[in-house]
Amino acid sequence: MEGSLFFTNATPSTSILKITDYKYLRLEKNDSTFVAELVLCRPKQYNSMDDDFYNEFISIYDEIQNDSKIRCVILRGEGKGLTAGLNLGKIAPLITGDSEVSQSQNNLDLFKMIRRWQASLDKINKCSKPTIALIHGACIGGGVDMITACDIRLCSSDAKFSIRETKLSIIADLGTLQRISKIVGSGFARELALTGKDIDAKTAERFNLVNHVYPDHDTLLSEGRKLALSIAQNSPLVVQATKLTLNHADDHTIDEGLYRVALQNAAFLKSDDLNESATSFFEKRQPIFKCNL
């Protein structure tokens, strides 16, 4: 029953969201490098987010997960920045609800919508393929929700970050508050979340929100693509299992993590990819990996 989400932490089902005509997102695949670029492609709207955006995001990450020719994902935005966050003009009617139904029904509909949006961005974290966020210009509100779900974050020197929801009298509800303390530390996370202030690229780097800052957008793209390629050239079986192991470590003890990785290596250590790594090393050629989780 849909109402059961009130009483459980279960992620809402998104299996019915299959979209073929994307308007907010573009997936650029390169079968020779095994790197895909997921592009927020509405620059005139500052790549802002609304209900249709989140539905597309669910569908496109299902496509990424199920495509064995994608080993690493780059997430980036077209135009002047990554995203300005929520499109408040389009979201406002969804929040105020339908005057022809009861307030309790409007509240339930809003709850379901928020849970679906949460599941949308959580697709990044749950996808076994690593995602690298390349951030330039504005990364506001929902943009921070999105990048904190990514595995690696890089930015250019013009990047600006804000948990802007606070200034709009909204609690950030799509993942930032659950993830950012683990990235930047509790004290600075609280400073950002309680003030809603902007921070620049250098501050983001100093507090580990991003790994590296590059002088301009072109350098960011070039270096981000090099990093993605270096990941995609490794065994996809090992890369994907490593990501899942790191995710598991976020909320389990060291002993639980060690037991899990022992089981994984007992199952996968003698893989075809291991044999291919050894063979290609002695033959002095690039390995040709075929295994995926």
From Swiss-Prot:
Binding site for substrate: A84, G85, L86, N87, L88, G142
Main localisation: mitochondrion
CDD domains assigned to the protein according to its UniProt record, in alphabetical order: crotonase-like
Residues under site feature: Important for catalytic activity: E165, D173
Keyword tags: Fatty acid metabolism, Isomerase, Lipid metabolism, Mitochondrion, Transit peptide
Molecular functions (GO terms): delta(3,5)-delta(2,4)-dienoyl-CoA isomerase activity
Protein localization: Mitochondrion
Record flagged with keyword Transit peptide: yes
Biological role stated in the UniProt entry: Isomerization of 3-trans,5-cis-dienoyl-CoA to 2-trans,4-trans-dienoyl-CoA.
Name the UniProt record assigns to this protein: Delta(3,5)-Delta(2,4)-dienoyl-CoA isomerase, mitochondrial
Organism per entry: Dictyostelium discoideum (Social amoeba)
